[in-house]
Amino acid sequence: MPEEMETQPAEVETFAFQAEIAQLMSLIINTFYSNKEIFLRELISNSSDALDKIRYESLTDPSKLDSGKELYIKIIPNKNEGTLTIIDTGIGMTKADLVNNLGTIAKSGTKAFMEALQAGADISMIGQFGVGFYSSYLVADRVTVHSKHNDDEQYVWESSAGGSFTVRPDSGEPLGRGTKIVLHVKEDLAEFMEEHKIKEIVKKHSQFIGYPIKLMVEKEREKELSDDEAEEEKKEEEDEKPKIEDVGEDEDEDKKDTKKKKKTIKEKYTEDEELNKTKPIWTRNADDITQDEYGDFYKSLTNDWEDHLAVKHFSVEGQLEFRALLFVPRRAPFDLFENKKRKNNIKLYVRRVFIMDNCEDLIPEYLNFIRGVVDSEDLPLNISREMLQQNKILKVIRKNLVKKCLELFEELAEDKENYKKYYEQFSKNLKLGIHEDSQNRAKLSELLRYHTSASGDEACSLKEYVSRMKENQKHIYYITGENRDQVANSSFVERVKKRGYEVVYMTEPIDEYVVQQMREYDGKTLVSVTKEGLELPEDEEEKKKREEDKVKFEGLCKVMKNILDNKVEKVVVSNRLVESPCCIVTAQYGWSANMERIMKAQALRDTSTMGYMAAKKHLEINPDHSIVETLRQKAEADKNDKAVKDLVILLYETALLSSGFTLDEPQVHASRIYRMIKLGLGIDEDEPIQVEEPASGDVPPLEGDADDASRMEEVD
């Protein structure tokens, strides 16, 4: 334990790590990871965030910087003591911050990161889950954090990761403001204290950090000694040597005087060397920047361990001037749609000065996966969040960013392989955009990809669907459901597919919201095959047959409606079924079965809407099916026949299930099925099966078992 802790034991407080954090630290310490170097990237990134915070606060209150004007990050390796120190002059942490942020309150990403690690994910993902600090234990067996916040005294946090940590007042060297992290580096990892290694890591991961990163380096220089110092040194040397008398000594001395030179010695000294002198990449000309430079900047900006998928670098000039650099990541973060998550990942700068990184009005929520920077020449430096909401300049910037993002997606769509990767990760965002962004709905609809009854394993665009439409086809047919197999085998698509029309398969819950907003595409109406009023092109003969069927089955429809009463709004003859006897369709503007399922699954649903949105069900019967034809004959013979009533209810409930609805009383339906099974097995409903209770613990043989056994012997 450090000396301060021994001299002031009363002031030392010990805390236990929250269980998930202790688990995570154990995982980090006890598992071998080859890329341990990412610890430095994470600590520098945290320092940069702390500097961002104090700079932002100082824009509205310059006195916040009285405790230290210069904003920088400093790295000090000390091989003699076996430590690596990272200092920043950021906002610092109060005692409560140290206790909460470094141990007792788990971040939302702690558990998710551990699960990802155990599933084989890369340790370098750690920063994306908000737990980057703990990567210190990849290289250190003890970590000490000194921190000073403007609103509190200076404190020290320390832990050797044994399940607990201590916090105490810091009586050591005052920091002014900021944080000093001292890593007590493991003996076998001394390379991380080497100057060349630190430079290599910073260049690789952090060269685009917006604050100076200084490394304390040890150098040598030659120092000239003055005549007096040289004489003194020479005298000391001569005093040590035995003196030998020489006859020609005086003559030699005269010669030496003429050749006397100033003596120099080598001395060691330390100085700070700035490691990231590169000017902000977004201010440079896009033609001069290589893909590798974009990749390095993206990784330093996002802490992502993978390369970006696409990049858009542009500037807008004229009445309004700003530059932007936008990236599409290769994969979606684990918490993309969490409410507590920041609404966007764009850093806002004003004339190269960082302002904020969670400006909600900068980009719409559906584009919250886009990473990058925007640097405005026109916004005031001391702008607050409240002022930004009203700012007209910001609205113009937002409009341009959306436009450029859509351009970027269109460019990406030209490369099928890359677009497939992008779509797998971010299709929900595009669909959310169709629901929320009416201005860009048409452009976003071009970016959608769906599997269809004719597309095989490849998803296709709506444009491709339209190009394959039959001559007499006026509508785009679609079906919503839980998965491809379910919708492909649905009774609703039977007739449509048989006629040779293509059906779009929409299998994500968000698709239900998409079709509510996107009523048409390229002048073609989107028509659900699960809703009433499905009209398929017909010739005169088909029309005539349909009219005849309506008349023929009118009586059965009335009987079925009377039996089902208010369970259905009406019973009609279907034009969409081929192999199934019946199906349940919904009203044109009501919920589909899939939407009803989604709404029932909402934890905070509004039950008042369930009634009027979900009630309008229509039962459609297939006039060409033998079950329906036989049922018609039975109903016409005796419409009060109990068997007809039972069969109609059973048909209705089965149709509910096959059409994607849930049953309100599944047990009653099960009882009906069991009754049908009994009938099939010839069991009389009225004869109860006698089961005698066994007298002892032994189970007696069932009635007839002995006979069965003897019969089995005969067979043998």
From Swiss-Prot:
InterPro entries: HATPase_C_sf (IPR036890), Heat_shock_protein_90_CS (IPR019805), HSP90_C (IPR037196), Hsp90_fam (IPR001404), Hsp90_N (IPR020575), Ribosomal_Su5_D2-typ_SF (IPR020568). Residues 221-263, 688-716 are annotated as: Disordered. The keyword Cytoplasm applies. It holds the Pfam family HATPase_c_3. PROSITE patterns: HSP90. GO terms for molecular function: ATP binding; ATP hydrolysis activity; ATP-dependent protein folding chaperone; unfolded protein binding. Residues 225-239 have a biased composition (Acidic residues). The TPR repeat-binding motif mediates interaction with TPR repeat-containing proteins. Interacts with shu. Homodimer. This is Heat shock protein 83. It comes from Bombyx mori. The gene is Hsp83.
